[in-house]
Amino acid sequence: MNQQSGLSIALLSESDGPAGAEKLLLQLAETLRERGYAVCPVVPGNGCGWLPAEFRRRAFTPELFVMRRPVDWRCLLGLVHTLRRRRVDVLHSHDFTMAVYGAAVAGILRRPHVITMHGGRYFAGRWSRRVALRAAAGHAAAAVAVSAALQADLATVLRLPRAAIRVLHNGIRPAVGSPNGVRRELGIGAEEPLIVAIGNLYPVKGHLVLLQALRALREDPAFARCHVAIAGRGEEETALRAYAAEHALTQHVHLLGYRADVPDLLAAADIFALPSRSEGVPLALLEAMFAGKGITASAVGGVPEVVTSEREALLVPSEDPPSLATALGRLLEDAALRLRLGDAARRRAEREFTVDTMVDGYMSVYANAVGRA
């Protein structure tokens, strides 16, 4: 095996779309390469193609797999062949499907296996998934959760002591954006309040709750010109557009689809909103913290581990439009509060949630995994 700085790490992703875990994988891969690791991305070859294209744009050579059914022996054997050819030292699987497949491949290749879970939706109410994940984790060199809240859930599901699951919070490399183009594109004046949310359009992200809060907020004439812009795509788009039309919000709700210019969106925003029903440690929240935005977020999952209410953000119960509307109103009417919370959030992000801090943690995990192999 290679020395620690020259290890070959296979990063396995079950999804190839533009979402938080996939963006995290790109930053993890880039930073590992900067530190002397060889990185082998392993990603779906029959999806939308965003993630393999992004890896290629960064001069990686991704390996593609095609999974035609939940248990696909041809896919499994293909992964074994590919990773044997690439001579990887450690398999690092992200989320449920690749945790299970990665466990099988690692067992055949006799390589250490690291599992990172980014959320808990995979095993809720599905006993077969719980059994499969428990088996995969039982054979892993390390199991990682991105928050202490998820660690507790996993420990219960996997019947492991919490200490057996390491917590490594996500970290990012921040980027600075420019606000002018976004507001001009959306037809929003500099004096009109803009609330930005970032996340694909699925029920778990709570975007309907945000629109319900906007409707309540605009009943106050002081906030009648308020706009909401949501970056993301997904199955709820039709329902969100229908709600906006039904309640005369169409001119104030902007569904933007996938956006590569998240730093610009945040620069244009007065407030960042995270109305999710469930989260690990969302990258969008970290991006908003680095941007120094006034933040209101649901107090779910790992969010309270990242921001403290009234110190770096205003936290509210999930699925509670009146509470969310109240928090948004407080931030909109109090520029000093936005500035204070935003500055505190940025300082905390710089201390605790950088990509370097995250990669330091994974380097330690890899070293321990290789030492046990």
Predicted regions and their residues:
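Carbohydrate-associated surface elements
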Residues: 149, 171
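A conserved, positively charged/aromatic
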Residues: 74, 113-142, 159
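Conserved acidic donor-binding segment of nucleotide-sugar-dependent glycosyltransferases
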Residues: 309-310, 314-321, 330-336
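Short hydrophobic beta-strand element within catalytic cores of glycosyltransferases
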Residues: 42-43, 294-297, 307
